[in-house]
Amino acid sequence: MMHIDSHQHFWKYDAREYGWIDESMKSLRRDFMPEHLESELKRNGFDGCIAVQARQTLEETRWLLELAGRHAFIKGVVGWVDLRSPELRLQLESFGRNPKLVGIRHIVQSEPDHRFLMRPEFLRGIATLEEFNLTYDILIYTRHLPVVSEFVARFDRQRSRIDLPD
């Protein structure tokens, strides 16, 4: 059986791009790259990890896929695409059905509308995501759980995973 760290971030730290890393998380205010992690994973009996986006940009998704292509222990990438965009299909196709792209995540917890998941343009995006056989990582706070129940009921074939930091 393979043991995988299912949620790992990589970044070259820049305070302007990672404003969410506040004073309470100051230990994260440094670079985190694959070469910093691989030996730790091995030492602790892990075979690899899933790299998860920390910035909501297509460039971040491309960069994580490049890292995954260079480091075999990165078994997959949960990236970002604009699930509300009329260009969503083109964004997804631009990754060429890369086998390392295993899922998509939108930082719902930062959206001011607590019912963001139920917006029509977002629902259309999730329906498109389903066609590409990618998981959807639902990053929320506890207060969003009632909406998540409604959301997942609409997509019974869509594989989803809840990220609940609180």
Indicate residue ranges for each PLM-predicted region.
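An N-terminally biased module of ancient metal coordination in phosphate/nucleic-acid-related enzymes
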Residues: 1-68
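Non-cysteine beta-strand/loop elements that form the S-adenosyl-L-methionine
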Residues: 5-9, 101-108, 160-166
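Conserved, mostly hydrophobic/aromatic
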Residues: 7, 49, 64, 77, ...
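Active-site mouth loops of central-metabolism enzymes
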Residues: 22-30, 52, 78-84, 110-117
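Short, acidic/polar
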Residues: 31-41, 59-62, 85-96, 118-122
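Catalytic beta/alpha-barrel core
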Residues: 54, 80-82, 105-108, 118, ...
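Catalytic pocket-lining loop regions of alpha/beta-barrel enzymes
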Residues: 116-166
